[in-house]
Amino acid sequence: MPVPQFDYLIIGQGLAGSILAFQLIARGQRVMVIDNDHKGSASQVAAGIINPITGHRLNLTDGFADYYSSASKLYQQLEQTLEVSLIRKIDQVRLLKNLGQASYFHKRLDQDDYVDFIETNKEASLFKNTEYGTAKIKQTSIVDTELLLQTFKKWLVDRNAYCNTFVDYSELGFAVDEVSYQDFSANRVIFCEGYQAINNPWLKDLPFKLAKGEILTIERQSNHESMMSWGNWLIPSTNDVAKLGSNYAWNDTDLQPSD
């Protein structure tokens, strides 16, 4: 029996597929990534926020320090490999929206686990109504997911490890310890399709719950350099541009901008 060309076929080159491919190739595995040039990809437009403090109660994510350490090392490896800057730290100024949230904030200030992550904000903010104050969230980071996908795709192409095509599931063939697609054969296939897995005949019955988020790219009217969050968020991107993000919609999940 002929040996398959690849160890893995990876369907989807979003953030998950890209990082998986990078890790497998670093371990000497033969990988082919198949993607339709990120059409409809959430990773392509994602803000890439790494946020240690979340929720109404300003909770520190369990295990954040370990997760962040691992993520930082990974993105540094990608930066060195791709020769681009992918991750940056940014202060986050969060609006305290009511008395209850302000109470949680003052409680967090007295907790040792939160010392490295939260403090009273002493700088000017863009918020007009700060009746309950603002908090500074430290160790927030932004990953440039669009740049990561673009440069990693080129890196794959240069290594003959990328195929730009729409996957027709009916053309996937399975045998013992082998999967084939068009002219490719591999030992395994891994689907990294994000929400598009709802159309995958082998995954469509899983209990997916789709959500639609939207991001506006807007002209900056301020030289404020911190991320602002108040349920929505505003991130300075360049000298002239900022990104404004919304909450999620659970019912309207098409790819069109909302009115």
What is each residue range found by the language model?
Residues 6-32:
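N-terminal Rossmann-like FAD-binding beta1-loop-alpha1 element of flavoenzymes
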Residues 12, 35, 96:
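Short beta-strand/turn micro-motifs composed of small residues
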Residues 19-27, 36, 49, 54, ...:
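Active-site substrate-recognition segment that forms the wall
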Residues 40-43:
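A short beta-to-alpha transition loop/helix N-cap that caps and shapes the active-site region
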Residues 56, 84-93, 119-155, 160-174, ...:
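Helix-loop-beta segment of a Rossmann-like dinucleotide-binding subdomain
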Residues 140-230, 251-253:
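Predominantly flavin-linked oxidoreductase catalytic cores and closely associated redox partners
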